[in-house]
Each structure stands twice: as structure tokens, then as C-alpha cells.
């Protein structure tokens, strides 16, 4: 069968927004608080997930600019100062909170699934790509770690030369890393990325790493 991803995304997004709207209802919040302290769990997740605010603002920005990639946004959000970022967080507060909420739902459900699998003696192998997408929160928040020009466009991109998979080679388009900058930080971004992924899986495979 053929999956119609557009329709699937539209359908699921509608359900997630409905779930968020219901959560904002005071009566529903009271019900959660008395049954399993859902609100406290959510607040703890938000406080302990240092990556969450940047991700939520990035996604809210994507919505605000109608899906445009970050390098085509207004300069105040394309490459914001700390003050400008705070202003956008306030301006898009409702959308930011929505993206925080659905990330919480995902992590909560994934944690339950992983625990169930582990209890049954099943280990989960995660797949972490060695490169990240140009239009991603990783690049938007860490421009100096990637080989970009002053406008945010990649100077060099990932790919492979001709091999037994493709006679003409492949151009993936992912921006390459600026390794000199990673060295200066002690590869902090990499360590954070791997540590985080190891919370989601028991083992990791670095994809396309040879």
C-alpha cells in the first residue's frame, strides 16, 4: 500500500492540537493533577530538557514563516541576539508551548515503550545520522559549528563519490562540520547529542560513518 504522508501528518496534527487545547482547559488540568500529577511531570520535563526551548521556538518559527527554511526568515529570528530570541519566545508563546507539550507526549510514551521492551528482555538499537539537515534546529542554533557563509548557506555539503550503490555518486546536501570549532568546545555538541540519544535507545549506530 502507499502511505499518503501529507494526509497522515494533517490528521495527526489535528489530534495533537486537540490534545493540547484540552490540556489547557482548567477542568482537564485538575483531572490530570488529581490522577497522576501530569502537570508536575510536564513541568519537570520542560525544566530538565535544555534543548526544548530552542526546538519549540524553531518549530514555531517554521509555522510563523509558513514552512520557510530558517535561512529565509527575518534576520531577527534567522540569527537572533539573546534579546531578540526572548522577544520571539514571547511573540510566539502559544505556539512554543504547543511544541513543548507534544514533545513531552512523545518522550513520555517512548519512555513507557522502551521500559516495556527492556522488561521483556528486548534491547533497542538507535540509528543516529552522522550529518544533520541544513534546515534543522541543530544548524540554526549552532551556526558556528557548521561550514556556512555569512547568509547561512553551506560552503561545503555532504555526499559520496560514485560507488557500487550509485554510478554517479550522491549529493546529500547536509552542511559539513567546522571541526576546528568543535575542537575548541571539546566536542561538547557531539557528547550532548550522543548522551541524549542513549537515553532513547540501548545501543547506537552512527549512520554512514566509515
Language-model-detected regions and their locations in the chain:
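Alpha-amylase-like alpha-glycosidases and glucanotransferases acting on alpha-linked glucans and related
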Residues: 1-107, 132-210
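Conserved, well-ordered alpha-helix/loop/beta-strand core segments that scaffold catalytic motifs
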Residues: 99, 103-132
Amino acid at each position: 500500500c502507499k502511505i499518503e504522508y501529507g494526509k497522515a501528518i494533517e490528521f495527526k496534527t489535528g489530534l495533537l492540537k486537540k490534545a493540547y487545547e484540552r490540556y489547557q482547559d482548567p477542568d482537564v488540568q485538575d483531572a490530570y493533577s488529581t490522577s497522576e500529577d501530569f502537570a508536575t511531570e510536564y513541568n519537570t520535563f520542560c525544566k530538565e530538557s535544555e534543548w526544548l526551548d530552542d526546538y519549540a521556538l524553531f518549530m514555531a518559527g517554521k509555522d510563523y514563516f509558513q514552512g520557510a527554511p530558517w535561512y529565509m526568515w527575518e534576520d531577527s529570528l534567522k540569527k537572533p541576539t539573546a534579546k531578540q530570541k526572548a522577544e520571539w519566545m514571547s511573540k510566539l508563546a502559544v505556539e512554543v508551548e504547543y511544541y513543548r507539550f507534544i514533545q513531552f507526549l512523545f518522550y513520555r510514551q517512548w519512555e513507557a515503550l522502551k521500559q516495556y521492551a527492556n522488561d521483556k528482555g528486548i534491547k533497542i538499537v538507535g540509528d543516529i545520522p552522522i550529518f544533520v539537515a541544513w534546515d534543522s534546529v541543530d544548524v540554526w542554533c549552532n551556526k558556528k559549528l557548521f561550514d556556512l557563509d555569512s547568509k547561512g548557506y553551506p560552503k561545503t555539503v555532504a555526499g559520496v563519490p560514485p560507488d557500487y550503490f550509485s554510478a554517479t555518486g550522491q549529493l546529500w546536501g547536509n552542511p559539513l562540520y567546522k571541526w576546528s570549532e568543535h575542537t575548541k568546545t571539546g566536542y561538547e555538541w557531539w557528547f550532548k547529542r550522543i548522551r541524549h540519544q542513549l537515553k532513547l535507545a540501548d545501543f547506537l549506530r552512527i549512520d554512514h560513518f566509515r
